């Protein structure tokens, strides 16, 4: 697919220029992607395929749910008959595959489910997409496939050394996707992004969990020492990265989507306490922190190079202070967008 077809403001008269399938579109990052596509590309039909798991919410899409170029289909990527029929009936041109089980803590107690959804489901989807001869297949992976590192920065050629069931399932799914390029020259592109934060994220992940705990006058639960660091990227920045890959990404390639902004979990908790509880006192901040048992494995860092996507013209734009303030405000008003969301605030999955 050329960049030109994404630059044209209008499609063919009486129809849509392209039909784009986004999997997991009621989830966190994919919902931001769908809103952007629906609003900015009115000549593209955006089809949201989601089975509506516990971490999904159609409220993430309320602003565009009645748009003429948006369609929601409830279904499971692991249902091969359904997926094949979907490609046949919807005449899909482009796939952005976000749908996955993503919570690392949960992957330790539901490893087989992660393998089934993330690996088998991806294989079902890429196979159906190949059979339907779609123009481009974007597989959304994670920096965690590299494993942790204290000093060495990972680039796209670094070996995959995942250390938890979630990362292992994403790495395995990458292998299936990449094999369709190697064997058939099917136009796949793989992305690996840093930790993304912002509105719409189910509060099992560290930033929305800490925000929600503090807003409910509960302590931040820190796994282990809390000295592990993560690179945080705002949701709208990662959407721009995916758009860049759609426009300019080369088939068969992998693109890291990272940021130099890095923060330890302890420092994250302190910053959120300062912003939400309005205190700079170290002793008062300690009163809002609860250290709990660590994960079975918990990588210290995921340092990652992103020069390759920089070469396509993308760089993150949203400063941390701006992004985190927007995120805090959103959770103040939208915490109950999910059913039984309170269970997400426990230190470990329940």
From Swiss-Prot:
One of its GO terms (molecular function) is dTDP-glucose 4,6-dehydratase activity. SUPFAM superfamilies: NAD(P)-binding Rossmann-fold domains. Its EC number is 4.2.1.46. It comes from the Eukaryota. InterPro entries: dTDP_Gluc_deHydtase (IPR005888), NAD(P)-bd_dom (IPR016040), NAD(P)-bd_dom_sf (IPR036291). Its cofactor is NAD(+). It is an enzyme of class 4 (lyase). Belongs to the NAD(P)-dependent epimerase/dehydratase family. dTDP-glucose dehydratase subfamily. It is linked to Catel-Manzke syndrome: A syndrome characterized by Pierre Robin sequence and a unique form of bilateral hyperphalangy causing a clinodactyly of the index finger. Pierre Robin sequence includes an opening in the roof of the mouth (a cleft palate), a large tongue (macroglossia), and a small lower jaw (micrognathia). This is dTDP-D-glucose 4,6-dehydratase. The gene is TGDS.
């Amino acid at each position: 697919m050329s960049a030109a077809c994404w630059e044209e403001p209008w499609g063919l008269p009486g129809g849509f220029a392209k039909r784009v399938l986004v999997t997991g579109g009621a989830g966190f990052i994919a919902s931001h992607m769908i809103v952007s596509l629906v609003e900015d590309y009115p000549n593209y039909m955006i089809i949201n395929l989601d089975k509506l798991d516990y971490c999904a919410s159609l409220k993430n899409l309320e602003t565009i749910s009645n748009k003429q170029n948006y369609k929601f289909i409830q279904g499971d990527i692991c249902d091969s008959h359904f997926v094949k029929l979907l490609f046949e009936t919807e005449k899909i041109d482009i796939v952005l595959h976000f749908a996955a089980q993503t919570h690392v803590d949960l992957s330790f107690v539901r490893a087989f489910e992660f393998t089934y959804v993330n690996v088998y489901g991806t294989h079902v989807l890429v196979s159906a997409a190949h059979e339907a001869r779609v123009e481009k297949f974007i597989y959304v992976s994670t920096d965690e496939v590299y494993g942790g590192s204290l000093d060495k920065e990972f680039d796209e050629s670094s070996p995959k050394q995942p250390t938890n069931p979630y990362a292992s399932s994403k790495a395995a799914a990458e292998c299936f996707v990449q094999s369709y390029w190697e064997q058939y020259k099917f136009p796949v592109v793989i992305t690996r992004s840093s930790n993304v934060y912002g509105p719409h994220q189910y509060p099992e992940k560290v930033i929305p969990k800490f925000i929600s705990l503090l807003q409910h006058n509960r302590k931040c639960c820190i796994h282990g020492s809390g000295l592990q660091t993560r690179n945080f990227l705002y949701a709208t920045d990662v959407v721009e990265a995916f758009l860049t890959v759609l426009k300019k990404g080369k088939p068969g390639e992998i693109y890291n989507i990272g940021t130099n902004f890095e923060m330890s979990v302890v420092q994250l908790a302190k910053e959120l306490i300062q912003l939400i509880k309005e205190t700079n006192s170290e002793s008062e901040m300690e009163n809002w922190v609860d250290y709990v048992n660590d994960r079975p494995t918990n990588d210290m860092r995921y340092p990652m190079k992103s020069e390759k996507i920089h070469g396509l013209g993308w760089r993150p734009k949203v400063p941390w202070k701006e992004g985190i303030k927007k995120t805090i405000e959103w959770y103040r008003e939208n915490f109950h967008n999910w059913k039984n969301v309170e269970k997400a605030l426990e230190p470990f999955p329940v």
